[in-house]
A protein has these predicted regions:
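Loop-rich non-cytosolic ectodomains and luminal regions
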Residues: 1-213
Length: 213
């Protein structure tokens, strides 16, 4: 993982790593969920644009939390609930949609990754079921805007915890951005705690409307 490697570099003498937070805060690519009490499940809905060739979604939770998922297409077609199995990888074909979905589980990082190939445009739903919960907190992320071929986003998104991967490393110097013309917040600049609780960015610098010679 990139953050681990950057932390290793920062631990060596005469080495400093500086990185930006990225511009994902306003992209609607982060969903923060919480399943508590008697809740049986929670839905994360993704709007998929026309002519999207494919994309992936990551679900991440902290140990010892475990979650199962099912996916519902815009037409209502639904795959069976996918239970957690170490190192499991399962592929599903939506008959009416012509869409293929691959779901991979990684227990070591409590991460689930789902790849959508030729997704039908419309509203896709990832339904999350608790298997083992302590806090009930989990997160889903879509790829960076530059890594997707369509404007796909969560219907109910959260702008927090939107740091790009390098900037979440504990020992790097992380820089956010602000509007230079009026010293106001730049809404797109990634921000908030990392998934492990570190406060980022370390400071902000002019990033928009910067005067030059």
């Amino acid at each position: 993982f990139l953050p681990s490697y950057l932390n290793y570099i920062c631990g060596r003498r005469k080495r400093v790593v500086v990185t930006a937070t990225g511009n994902e805060a306003n992209a609607r690519h982060h969903f923060q969920g919480r399943i508590i009490g008697e809740m049986e499940h929670e839905d994360a809905e993704i709007t998929v644009e026309e002519n999207t060739k494919g994309f992936f979604v990551e679900l991440l939770a902290s140990a010892p939390e475990l979650y199962a998922v099912t996916i519902i297409s815009p037409s209502g077609e639904q795959i069976p609930r996918i239970l957690v199995r170490r190192g499991a990888s399962e592929q599903f074909n939506f008959i009416f949609e012509g869409t293929t979905i691959t779901v991979d589980y990684r227990i070591d990082t409590k991460e689930t990754a789902s790849r959508f190939i030729r997704p039908t445009p419309g509203l896709w739903t990832i339904r999350i079921f608790p298997q083992l919960t302590v806090t009930g907190n989990y997160h889903l992320w879509l790829p960076l805007r530059e890594l997707t071929d369509g404007n796909n986003f969560f219907l109910r998104s959260n702008p927090e915890i939107t740091l790009t991967s390098p900037s979440a490393a504990r020992q790097v110097i992380t820089v956010g951005g602000y509007q230079a013309s009026n010293t106001s917040i730049y809404a797109d600049s990634g921000r908030d705690y990392t998934i492990t609780g570190e406060i980022k960015p370390d400071f902000v610098a002019p990033a928009v409307d910067v005067d030059g010679p």
